[in-house]
Regions:
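Short glycine/proline-centered loop/turn elements that form peptide/ligand docking sites
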Residues: 115-118, 132-142
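Conserved beta-strand in the GNAT
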Residues: 41, 47-55, 63-68
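A short beta-loop-alpha structural element at the N-terminal edge
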Residues: 1-10
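Conserved GNAT acetyl-CoA-binding A-motif
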Residues: 90-114
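Conserved active-site tyrosine of GNAT-family acetyltransferases
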Residues: 122, 127
């Protein structure tokens, strides 16, 4: 579980990824999220190496609001483990749908195709694209909403 004492390590993770976290407002929003939202951390050699924050929008759905692994720890399975842990815990609480937003395919790549890799990562974790949204809070960029069923279907 992410605790307030993990926040500086999460800030350092964000600082290690300037090609993903280049917008100062986004960096500030992420810093606030790791201090106030529910979240999870993964460690490597005893240090926080990755984090994920979630927000519950209603009793049956949640959103991954921020997720990152330190540049030196990317592609080691930490992100996948964080998603699976969060999904299992949320499902036990009755959440049935998990969503995440990332830059959509309509956004021109400026950083070496980083976000196509992000979209592929989420697809490999069972997320499917739902729709692209133009978000004013993202400087009018197009965000792709991806969703994944995680809990048991509701019975009537």
């Amino acid at each position: 579980m992410l605790t307030p004492t993990d926040a500086p390590a999460c800030d350092a993770i964000v600082a290690s990824l300037p090609y993903f976290f280049g917008d100062p407002a986004g960096v500030r929003d992420c810093a606030a999220a790791v201090r106030w939202q529910r979240g999870y951390v993964a460690t490597a050699d005893g240090d926080v190496a990755a984090f994920l924050t979630v927000e519950r929008h209603n009793p049956e759905s949640a959103e991954i609001t921020w997720m990152a692994a330190h540049a030196s720890q990317r592609r080691h399975g930490l992100g996948r483990r964080l998603i699976e842990h969060a999904a299992a815990e949320l499902a036990r609480e009755g959440v049935r749908m998990l969503c995440v937003l990332t830059l959509g395919p309509s956004v021109p790549e400026e950083a070496g195709d980083n976000y196509s890799g992000t979209r592929a990562f989420y697809a490999s974790c069972g997320f499917v694209p739902l729709r692209e949204l133009e978000l004013r809070s993202w400087n009018d960029a197009y965000a792709l909403m991806l969703v994944r069923a995680i809990g048991a279907p509701r019975t009537r």
